[in-house]
Amino acid sequence: MIIETERLYLRELEQTDIESLSKILQDEQTMYAYEGAFDDGEVQNWLTKQIDNYQRDGFGLWAVILKQTNEMIGQCGLTWQDFSDQTVLEIGYLFQREFWHNGFATEAAKACKQYAFEQLNAQEVYSIIRDTNAASQKVAERNGMVRCGEFIKHYRGVDMPHYLYRAVSYTHLRAHETSLHL
């Protein structure tokens, strides 16, 4: 287990999670921000990428497990993403549709932000969200993030407008404020 919250725990994805992951990544409505559901090969590539991220970075998108049932209901975690001319640490989340609107994404995303600031000593974290994904934008806002940019992301042959959300570590902000007053 990587992170535990009141109702959830987050752990590394494993090959045995492929069926649960497919419920998320092969659902058309869940994946509309990605221009449609993934096929079996894309799901396997997604899983392999996360396992590679754990080995390379020590983190990635983690399986979100509902404590009450021990069921994998989504994924949430931290990944490096390219934005403009820099690489940023992103909090990402995707949940099975039947678990939407229960606060699980917000609960997991807040825990990932705390993990980034306290365990990884990150100075800031971002969320990159499709302009049409109002629910994910609300999760970012509830996670203390502020929209700070807009850009076009090219994916699956489509130009997709996205918003960039950002949160700054309080510790980093205090250090910056202190240095300004000296």
For each of these PLM feature ranges, what is it?
Residues Q15, G36-A37, G41-E90, V168-Y170:
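Acetyl-CoA-dependent GNAT
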Residues S127-Q137:
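Conserved beta-strand-loop-alpha-helix junction that forms the acyl-donor binding cleft
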Residues L120-I128:
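Conserved GNAT acetyl-CoA-binding A-motif
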Residues M1-T48:
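A short, well-structured alpha-helix characteristic of acyl/acetyltransferase catalytic modules
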